[in-house]
């Protein structure tokens, strides 16, 4: 009787022959990084941010809300915060690489403000100081399915007439009925119509990541300390009633709207899948089925997600996180298998493959109270801008 090893030889020969025919075939997407549930990753990221903020401020626990004075922030503190935020945004814009998709044409869409007669406006107190503009986010998502596809967004208003010079300010509505300052404009007197435009790209991107059905802006007269009259003198088309027939139709078509410029989804997917991945750090995820290391968008609302009311500005921010496999080639004609075995022997608990980690991070300016004293601080490395395999 032949030895047992010889009896197994006929069974091993077909397997050896198959391996010889495919010596250089890669193991597709091979990675020892564990598959992670998306919701679990988000929850862990939120909890990590909770500890990160407290640690950076050297706080053992969130500050008490009992001593915080009611009312808006002091004007000097708000001005300091706005200038810090603008400086950070300016530095980010200088280092932002031009995406490949910017070379191609953008689809332009107009989303009209919800008509002024809608019951949504009944929730806002009538005021001679401000006007309100609300938008249906389902129409926004229909025009721009993914936040990363948005190239630019402007809110445009048709000013009909203005008898005196006036300083106006634009605010963004938050879910807790507070308002965040965005921009301002000094308007000169004029009897002829003129379109006013405000860049609200960041705000609309934020709306696209949230689940609110209605979002809005407020246009207000600047509240000057030395002025007793804070009435909004600007006549904006779309905010008066009583018009009939064709005049009402024209009036409604020219009401405030969002002008959106975005890369069509099918074009973005084509560009994303066809270009070489030598620079993973510049890629944002275009869908939930992304198969490469990329930046996943995650918006943190301080009140909703962390239960915090002590951070006064901002109300939230895009923290983001990195996720996705980092595939490598494992060929039978290389010595990599020997190195891998040696690595696993000395590091049994570590990942044998590169993992998706943050590469570029941005700071986050905040306003919070210590007792009754407001403070402006800049927290370093809070926003994930790009990722890499490491």
Swiss-Prot record:
Enumerate the residue ranges of region (Arm domain): 75-271
Alphabetical list of Pfam families matching this protein:
TGF_beta, TGFb_propeptide
Q: Which UniProt keyword terms apply here?
A: Cleavage on pair of basic residues, Disulfide bond, Extracellular matrix, Glycoprotein, Growth factor, Mitogen, Secreted, Signal
Query: Where are the disulfide bridges?
Result: 285-294, 293-356, 322-387, 326-389
The record's section on SMART domains has: TGFB (SM00204)
Where along the sequence do coiled-coil regions lie?
none
> PANTHER family in the record, alphabetically?
TGF-BETA FAMILY, TRANSFORMING GROWTH FACTOR BETA-1 PROPROTEIN
What is the name of the protein in this document?
Transforming growth factor beta-1 proprotein
Q: Which organism is it from?
A: Bos taurus
**Gene name for this UniProt entry:** TGFB1
């Amino acid at each position: 009787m032949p030895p047992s090893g010889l009896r197994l030889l006929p069974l091993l020969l077909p397997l050896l022959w198959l391996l010889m025919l495919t010596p250089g075939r890669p193991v597709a997407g091979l990675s020892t990084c564990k598959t992670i549930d998306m919701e679990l990753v988000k929850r862990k990221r939120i909890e990590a941010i909770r500890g990160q903020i407290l640690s950076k401020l050297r706080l053992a626990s969130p500050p008490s809300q009992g001593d915080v004075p009611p009312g808006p922030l002091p004007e000097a503190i708000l001005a300091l915060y706005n200038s810090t935020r603008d400086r950070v945004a300016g530095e980010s814009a200088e280092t932002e690489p031009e995406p490949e998709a910017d070379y191609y044409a953008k689809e332009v869409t107009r989303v009209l403000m919800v008509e002024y007669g809608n019951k949504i406006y009944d929730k806002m107190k009538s005021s001679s100081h401000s006007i309100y503009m609300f938008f249906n986010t389902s129409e926004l998502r229909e025009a721009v399915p993914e936040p990363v596809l948005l190239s630019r967004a402007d809110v445009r208003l048709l000013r009909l007439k203005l008898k005196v010079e006036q300083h106006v300010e634009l605010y963004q509505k938050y879910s807790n009925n507070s308002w965040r300052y965005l921009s301002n404009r000094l308007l000169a007197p004029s009897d002829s119509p003129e379109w006013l435009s405000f860049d609200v790209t960041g705000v609309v991107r934020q709306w696209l990541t949230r689940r609110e059905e209605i979002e809005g802006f407020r246009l207000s007269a600047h509240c000057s300390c030395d002025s007793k009259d804070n009435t909004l003198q600007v006549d904006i088309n779309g905010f008066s009633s009583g018009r009939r027939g064709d005049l009402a139709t024209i009036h409604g078509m020219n009401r405030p709207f969002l002008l959106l410029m975005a890369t069509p989804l099918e074009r973005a997917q084509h560009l994303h899948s066809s270009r070489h991945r030598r620079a993973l750090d510049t890629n944002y995820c275009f869908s939930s089925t992304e198969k490469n290391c990329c930046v996943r968008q995650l918006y943190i609302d301080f009140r909703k997600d962390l239960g915090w009311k002590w951070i006064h500005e901002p109300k939230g921010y895009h923290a983001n996180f990195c996720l996705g496999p980092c595939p490598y080639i494992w060929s039978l004609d290389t010595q990599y298998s020997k190195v891998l075995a040696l690595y696993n022997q000395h590091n049994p608990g570590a990942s044998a493959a590169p993992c998706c980690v943050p590469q570029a991070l941005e700071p986050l300016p905040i306003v919070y109270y210590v007792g009754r004293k407001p403070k402006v601080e800049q927290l370093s490395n809070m926003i994930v801008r790009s990722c890499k395999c490491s």
